[in-house]
């Protein structure tokens, strides 16, 4: 599987519940289009833990998006860049509620 980690903060005017709903709507749509296989629950960073050694980033939240493989991920990105509706609005709704985003991607080793 191929994965994308997103570390982010919410904009002050948005709630976690609003973002969770927007993310669920977007992710469900993308799955229905064959452009993803799901996402993780949203995590709350525990930066005061000894296990958290990342001193470069201060984002409060994180989540994973999962793809069958790199090709499906690339197809999802191409779809987003096409600005086709309703994906454009669903992506923008979720994306616009966040700030300070960092993305990291990887593929599982078999």
Q: What are these language model-derived features?
A:
Residues 8-12, 67-68:
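Short, flexible beta-strand-to-coil junctions
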Residues 41-45, 104, 108:
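Acidic carboxylate-rich catalytic motifs and surrounding loops in phosphoryl-/glycosyl-chemistry enzymes
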């Amino acid at each position: 599987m191929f994965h994308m980690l997103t570390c982010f903060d919410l904009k002050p005017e948005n709630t976690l519940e609003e973002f969770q709903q927007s993310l669920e709507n977007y992710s469900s749509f993308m799955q229905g289009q064959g452009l993803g296989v799901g996402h993780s629950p949203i995590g709350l960073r525990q930066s005061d833990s000894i296990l958290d050694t990342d001193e470069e980033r201060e984002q409060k939240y994180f989540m994973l998006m999962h793809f069958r493989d790199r090709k499906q991920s690339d197809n999802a990105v191409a779809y987003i860049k096409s600005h086709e509706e309703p994906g454009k609005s669903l992506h923008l709704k979720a994306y616009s509620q966040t700030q300070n985003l960092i993305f990291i991607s990887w593929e599982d080793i078999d």
